[in-house]
Amino acid sequence: MQVKENKQLCLISLGCSKNLVDSEVMLGKLYNYTLTNDAKSADVILINTCGFIESAKQESIQTILNAAKDKKEGAILIASGCLSERYKDEIKELIPEVDIFTGVGDYDKIDILIAKKQNQFSEQVFLSEHYNARIITGSSVHAYVKISEGCNQKCSFCAIPSFKGKLQSRELDSILKEVENLALKGYKDMTFIAQDSSSFLYDKGQKDGLIQLIKAIDKQQALKSARILYLYPSSTTLELIGAIESSPIFQNYFDMPIQHISDSMLKKMRRNSSQAHHLKLLDAMKQVKESFIRSTIIVGHPEENEGEFEELSAFLDEFRFDRLNIFAFSAEENTHAYSLEKVPKKTINARIKALNKIALKHQNHSFKALLNKPIKALVEHKEGEYFYKARDLRWAPEVDGEILINDSELATPLQPGHYTIVPSVFKDNILLAKVLSPF
């Protein structure tokens, strides 16, 4: 029997869903603590940091400083994850308020580090396996599954390989065991994630690893629905798009950050791809029935000129992504682009403002296209007193949108799970829907 310690833990997980998986592994090691959202009452405050771009670093630092100010006497403050790893040589002096620093290699040893009250930075980047117990957060029906760590790409702007290392794929059997274990606990919807999902198993000499994963999950039949995030253009193929389209489990969801469309900019960004390849993949994705396409672009990369920006702008307006992340270039140490001549911030801000208008126009069109027709959805939990929170089954959690179902229109309370619903109203970036039936 698991016995709870009479101690409280406040976990703050910053950054991406990949970070969240590592946070859930740490929760698994600290199962005997009582969880609290109140840092002031916690005996242990654990902040899993993000160190991706400047804004993320500032958020991590501010969160640490706020926790240091709020923590009670005797409480332990821990900073783990990417920011700690990236700046491990200087961070102890820069933020002396922290009691324990650890990076990206020791998530499964967090209980030992707390007991010994010691710092640790293992060289090997940690990759969660099926035998690492996780406490899933935020949902009783959805879980993330990390299929690899690190990245072999050499993008000019990205510092991630400098602290997350080379591509390190899990064995397919380990992933299948984790999926089975989670499905037995009721998690029937999963999102598969990595730094570069489409390169899964490249490090083991296999070029169709993600296709094999899709086929294995289909054959296993443990899940009702799934999707894949973070496809990289140069390792994404028409065959992979076809495998997703043919799958009864994987949704027709395509998340492929293109970063730019101009050939000259793709070369400057060292993306190892071309406009022609992007267009071939994107057109194939659009041909898939009821496909949902998300992408990411960077505005103001060094040497981006007006002509290249106009080319990008015209393409985005013509293609009409369902969702689009727009980032301002962030100059990061240990990257090729760091020392290149910068585009003025004023120019970057003006370009982002113009692209945001385009992105919002097409996003709203994507939402409105769902009105007054049956769609498959996942109901996750009660949101406030009167509504259930749901999402289109194609959507990734948190980032793609929100659907609310009014409980006053229901004969009986809803259990989390899969339902056919009909959205009827789109207002304030939210869809309101009625439930037809479970499936």
Swiss-Prot record:
Belongs to the methylthiotransferase family. RimO subfamily. GO terms for cellular component: cytosol. [4Fe-4S] cluster 2 binds at C151, C155, C158. Its EC number is 2.8.4.4. Residues 137-368 form the Radical SAM core domain. It is found in: Cytoplasm. CDD domains: Radical_SAM. This is Ribosomal protein uS12 methylthiotransferase RimO. It comes from Helicobacter pylori (strain HPAG1). Keywords: 4Fe-4S, Cytoplasm, Iron, Iron-sulfur, Metal-binding, S-adenosyl-L-methionine, Transferase.
